[in-house]
Design a protein with these regions (language model features):
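Conserved glycine-rich cofactor-binding loop
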Residues: 17-19
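Residue(s) in the substrate-gating loop at a strand-loop-helix junction
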Residues: 146
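C-terminal helical subdomain
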Residues: 186, 201-238
Length: 253
């Protein structure tokens, strides 16, 4: 639960090895020691390294096993996150899979893996988290969507379609939870230089995880429901969304 002056005291990260999520946790915690963080992710070196980095910043870190490809892990993981420690102030839904885009539109298994991780698991976790936050009577959800969901592009339309669905769900969840006083912040970043995008050509308006974290923190504090990172990406995507198909398909995107 937030402290007497409204500072966040406990954060849960579903997808606890995400570069953007870790940068956001550091930004939300500021320099205050003792903030409690639960990292829900697959066990391994990446989760251990993430935990160590946050502990070095003065946070109290716990780890929970969670695998977005394993349907049986969702209830167990989220129950563990909520049933140990203080009330949860913020839950970040930060797991995701970029995948091989050329394979994804030609291979059923590759396509379904993207759907399972980016959409089905995200929806299931949203339902479970919403129930927990309603039960405790407060909290916020940060849902990591993507600008890729705004309009299908030849280069990543399978990934983009899963993010479009995830985005719609969390936008609607925000409507549903408004009466309970629970904020749902949908984050639509453009290209972010992270481990997931390593090896890809850097796109215009690319950002670091720390830059995205600043946008997220500001949006959360302001009570926003949607933020773009960088903010100018909103206008770029608005233009692209309204271009005629004959023009859009000639663009190198």
């Amino acid at each position: 639960m937030k402290d007497a002056v409204g500072n966040i005291q406990r954060v849960v990260v579903l997808g606890g090895t995400s570069d953007i999520a870790l940068a956001t946790v550091l930004r939300l915690a500021g320099r205050r020691p003792g903030v409690q963080v639960t990292l829900a992710a697959r066990p391994g070196e990446r989760r251990a390294a993430a935990s160590t980095s946050l502990q070095s910043a003065g946070m109290q870190v716990s780890e929970v096993d969670f695998d977005a490809t394993d349907r049986t892990s969702y209830e167990r993981a989220i129950a563990s996150c909520f049933e140990t420690g203080a009330d949860v102030d913020v839950v970040m839904v930060a797991f995701g899979l970029l995948g091989d885009q050329e394979r994804a539109w030609q291979d059923v298994d590759a396509a379904l893996e993207l759907v399972q991780v980016n959409y089905a698991a995200a929806v299931a976790c949203g339902v479970l988290v919403a129930g927990r936050l309603r039960a405790q009577g407060h909290g916020a959800i940060i849902a990591m969507s993507s600008a890729a969901g705004e309009r299908p592009r030849r280069s990543n339309f399978v990934y983009g379609s899963t993010k479009a669905g995830m985005d719609s769900f969390y936008t609607g969840l925000g409507y549903a939870l408004a009466a309970d006083g629970i904020q749902v912040l949908v984050v639509r970043p453009g290209f972010v230089r992270t481990k997931m995008t390593a090896g890809l050509d850097v796109a215009p308006l690319s950002q670091t995880p720390e830059q995205v974290a600043e946008v997220i923190a500001a949006g959360l504090l302001a009570g926003r429901h949607t933020v773009w990172a960088p903010p100018t990406m909103r206008w770029v995507m608005s233009v692209l969304r309204h271009l005629p198909r004959s023009v859009f398909t000639r663009l190198p995107v």
